[in-house]
Structures are given as structure tokens and as C-alpha cells.
């Protein structure tokens, strides 16, 4: 390996070490291997929320028999927004709709384990997008424009 390749490898390892320190192992793994990323073509509800930082997170929900059957997210934001969107989607899958209403930024943060103080707002943003998608679904259902059962 030449000096340049060694420099690049060393730099990459330092970046990974810093990310592990900042996000913990679960957050680091999700940063490197995002899950539930992408749009659900057959989503029953979707919401896009933009935070004060300028990042946006979209949450997509597939709902059947009163439960979140599938969820996904898309973000135009930073790596922390991606981590938080991924965990918010994961937390929703398999839960009944009432249980999903309890998912907030603290729930997302607890699932990740830790985030830098300056990035914690991303957990709130992901939870807000999830709650907005659920709210839109419930509003359509209550108005008779959605499925016969939530």
C-alpha cells in the first residue's frame, strides 16, 4: 500500500472512530447501513416535516388492521437525520396505532442510545414526521375518506 492509500485508510478509520464515539455502536451501524430508507409506493400515509435546522424528513406508513405494517423514511438532511428517521420507522413497524402515538423524540433517542447534544433535535424531527403521518392517516379515516377501520 502506498503512502496516499495509507493516509486515506487512516483518515477513514479516524472518521469512523469519531462517529462511533458520537453516535454509539447502534447509531454508527445505522449511519453506515441505513434501514427503512426510501419511499413506500403503496403507503397509506406520508408526511414531510422540516426542522429549524433546514433538514426535512419524510415518513411513509403502510397500515393494516390497525397496525403499522411497514414504514420508511427519506431525508435531505445530515447523517443524524438519517439515523433518526431510520429508528423512527423501525420503532413504528408492528405497533398498533395507539402505541405509535407514544413515540416521541426521547423514544427515538433512547432507541439509538446517544447523539451529540447539537444533533438531538433530529430525533424530535423524526418523531414529528412520524406523528404527522399518523395524524394525516387518522384524519382521513375519521372523515370517511380512508379505510373502513384504522
Mark where each language-model region is.
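C-terminal binding/interaction regions
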Residues: 1-41, 46, 64, 95-150
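Short beta-strand elements
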Residues: 55-66
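A short catalytic or substrate-binding loop motif that flags glycine-/basic-rich loops and adjacent residues
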Residues: 40, 50-54
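Short, thiol/selenol-centered motifs that function as redox-active sites or metal-ligating centers
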Residues: 75-83, 122
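Immediate flanking context of iron-sulfur cluster ligation sites
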Residues: 67-76, 113
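Alpha-helical support elements that line or immediately flank enzyme active sites
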Residues: 80-98
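Short, solvent-exposed loop/turn elements at beta->coil junctions and helix N-caps
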Residues: 45-49, 74
Amino acid at each position: 500500500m502506498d503512502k496516499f492509500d495509507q493516509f486515506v485508510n487512516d483518515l477513514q478509520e479516524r472518521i469512523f472512530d469519531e462517529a462511533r464515539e458520537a453516535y454509539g455502536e447502534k447509531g454508527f451501524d445505522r449511519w453506515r447501513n441505513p434501514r427503512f430508507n426510501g419511499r413506500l409506493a403503496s403507503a397509506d400515509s406520508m408526511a414531510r416535516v422540516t426542522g429549524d435546522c433546514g433538514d426535512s424528513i419524510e415518513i411513509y406508513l403502510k397500515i393494516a388492521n390497525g397496525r403499522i405494517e411497514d414504514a420508511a423514511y427519506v431525508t435531505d438532511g445530515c447523517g443524524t437525520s438519517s439515523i433518526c428517521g431510520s429508528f423512527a420507522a423501525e420503532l413504528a413497524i408492528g405497533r398498533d396505532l395507539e402505541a405509535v402515538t407514544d413515540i416521541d423524540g426521547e423514544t427515538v433517542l433512547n432507541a439509538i442510545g446517544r447523539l451529540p447534544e447539537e444533533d438531538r433535535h433530529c430525533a424530535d424531527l423524526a418523531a414529528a414526521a412520524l406523528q404527522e403521518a399518523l395524524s394525516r392517516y387518522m384524519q382521513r379515516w375519521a372523515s370517511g375518506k380512508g379505510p373502513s377501520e384504522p
